[in-house]
Amino acid sequence: DEFVFGNHTRGGLKTYRKNCFSEIGGVLEVDGWDGVDRIIAEKNGWKSRNFPKIRVEHRRKTGSYDGVLKGCYDSGSFSYCMGYYPPFFLARSIHRMLRKPYFIGGIFMILGYIAAITSRKPKSLDKESISFLRTEQRSILRNWQKFAFKTNEK
């Protein structure tokens, strides 16, 4: 079981209202698109959620196509491109260190983030959307006890 926040749905399981899909400009061809579309939709006043009681079997863990460490590295890069609030990203990386492969997965996330900074990768979101995302992430950090050890319901 993989944890996702209640307002995020993994890419292959997404459905959209027609008006929302039009407003967000469709599915953008960027890494982390399934997070980008959620942020833009919610910034525009749409509600987003997942349905954890609907069971779906993925054939592999998210981000593991090229191996878990490459997935962690890419996750760090996507996080930078999406404009993650740095303290939130650091907390997320530390949280990743608590899962296999222990410690090194979080280190690879940080390396991916740093590589994206140094290579000046372009942002996937506009400044207004990044501000919206960071406000959400600051709220999560302030209420971290609700999320720290949470897993989705079975």
List the predicted regions and their residue ranges.
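Non-catalytic, C-terminal membrane-associated alpha-helical segments of glycosyltransferases
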Residues: 71-154
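A recurrent flexible, glycine/aromatic-enriched loop bordering the glycosyltransferase active site
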Residues: 1-23, 74-80
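Short, charged helix-to-loop "capping" segments that act as catalytic/coupling loops
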Residues: 26-29, 100
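Long, contiguous hydrophobic alpha-helical segments, chiefly transmembrane helices and signal peptides
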Residues: 14-16, 37, 41, 86-91
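Outer-membrane beta-barrel translocator/channel fold
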Residues: 63-66
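A short, conserved alpha-helix in the catalytic core of glycosyltransferases
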Residues: 20-23, 30-61
